[in-house]
């Protein structure tokens, strides 16, 4: 019985890895739904959980990544200003971005889809998230560019 359970677990992991391998590193949300569901299962830990429940740290590190995207876009002369999207980021346990899914919001300015995918792909190859975890993790939220933030001291 124990070996049957082990065999089933190995088969499930193999199937999930195969499905994950079929999804591009950068993809449009709403495409490849089965592969996307597989990513959500493989990266089931949230950014907040990876931050040990510290919402301030999770938010600050997310904001840092958004600002790094702004800086990188400016450095390579890629105009992100006015882009508004839903963004789902999947990190490996080591903080490297493994996958990014996005969907432009209806109030976003138009941007070439292939160029945006190329930008995200290039960015994720250069950026490592400061938070590390015992398991892969993810975060899904809205993002707008440029990134504005103001610290308020209470």
What do the predicted segments below correspond to?
Residues 1-24:
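Bacterial Sec-dependent N-terminal signal peptides
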Residues 19-154:
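Charge-biased low-complexity segments
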